[in-house]
Amino acid sequence: MNTHPRVVYDCMIYLQAAAKPDRIHGTIRLVREGRVELCMSPEIVDELRDVLTRPEVRAKFPALTPERADVFLNDLLPQARLFQNVPAAFTLPRDVKDQPYVNLAIAARANYLVTWNERHLTYLMRQDTSEGQDFCRRFPEIKIVDPPTFVSEIQRSLLP
């Protein structure tokens, strides 16, 4: 049984890592080193495949060829735990497109949801919004943080 922290990454985390093959992102490195348990769902994998192969994304990130996207996914997916049939446990009125990430974090009993999306996701950690109060009350075990905070917290937890 894996006792490492469980994590859900939003789409932008994957996009940044796949688009810049010359750098190993700390978030992905933690997965590859087995320091965290990456949680994914078929819905998120499908979205990721779609985003990584969009012409406008490839135009912005020329290094992100279809072959590079395939290699990235083929390397990452065997290291992830796939959760099927994730129920809709929480409604995200600000952006329903982000609901699969929140609901996966809930279903996977993740410790972290890592995102750059302050407007639609990290606000759920704030007590000055009704959504934040509801989320924190119902799911206190999930921390929604940005990548630098996540990497720092995991690295600190690994210190002797």
Provide a role label for each language-model segment.
Residues M1-M40:
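Short, well-structured N-terminal submotif of metal-dependent ribonuclease cores
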Residues M12-I13, E43, R119, T149:
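Alpha-helix/helix-capping structural signal
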Residues Y14-A17, P62, A88-R94:
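Short, flexible loop segments at the rims of nucleotide/cofactor-binding pockets, characterized by
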Residues P21-I24, R29, T53-R54, Q127-S130, ...:
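Short, glycine/charged-enriched secondary-structure capping and boundary segments
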Residues L30, L104, C136:
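Hydrophobic/aromatic ligand-binding patch that stacks against planar heteroaromatic rings
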Residues R32-R35, C39-P87:
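PIN-domain endoribonuclease scaffold, especially VapC-family toxins
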Residues L77-R119, Y123-R126:
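Active-site neighborhoods of divalent-metal-dependent phosphate/nucleic-acid chemistry enzymes
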Residues Q99, A108, Y112, R119-P160:
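Acidic, PIN/NYN-like endoribonuclease modules and their adjacent C-terminal/linker elements
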